[in-house]
């Protein structure tokens, strides 16, 4: 895998992107469809391609969605630590895009992921079989964006 050089922009600092008003690229739509079908490994592969190729800070939107999804793959595999770490990191990447970006309802994804963090804390690392799977979010589109 090719790793891009470190960008000047870091999540949580400055404006998220001048491109947030643009329509979502095809791979973002595909990755979100995969996320929403519970295909978390596949969404990682799809969104990683978009993230690597994107020079604009909107790449952190892709990275945030990607990491939240990979967190659910970790949960599925019984790795509570990995799930927690990736959800928190993903939320950090998504924070600058609150209010929505490229039609993605970022606020809802953050809130839903935070509910999953709280549920994971409730059941504990050794109680993953009690995790309420109905809390696993979908990435939703803002009204008029789908």
Where is each model-derived feature located?
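Short, solvent-exposed positions on alpha-helices
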Residues: 41, 59, 81-85
